[in-house]
Amino acid sequence: MVSAEILKSFSLFSGLAQPELAEIAKLCRERAYERHSLIFTIGGSATDVYLLETGKVDIQIEFKIHDYEMVATVYTVGRGEIFGWSALVPPHRLTASARCEGKADVIMMNGKELMEFLEKDKRIGYVIMKNLSALISSRLASTTIALRHEIQKLIKK
């Protein structure tokens, strides 16, 4: 069972009190993934938010420029970080794929259930969505840098 203490270590929940985290913990379930497991695929329906407890998960996108196709890792999620945030943001479509580098343990929350909970407590909802917007901004910056790097490699070929 996921504890409030574990959730406290994730930046998504920064600013929440122990009793609030305990309520959110009730929405959580745990899952283990094997090395190289594909957790989700770009373009799919985003139903769950993932919190990484152990391991590393590569966030990848596929792209094609003329006849050149490739899969680029645009971010590597580390312990204590979240991914699959599209489950909380319309249109709830996955903007990338997620693949485990090695074994990984994750905490999962159904996005719809979490949003229903956040609707009931506007303060908690505000705190989490504020933290989420900072995360999305950071990931967008990381993705831009990673794509520039991949395009530069392509141009040099």
Regions found by a protein language model. Give the residues of each.
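Cytosolic regulatory regions built on CNB/CRP/Popeye-like sensor folds
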Residues: M1-K157
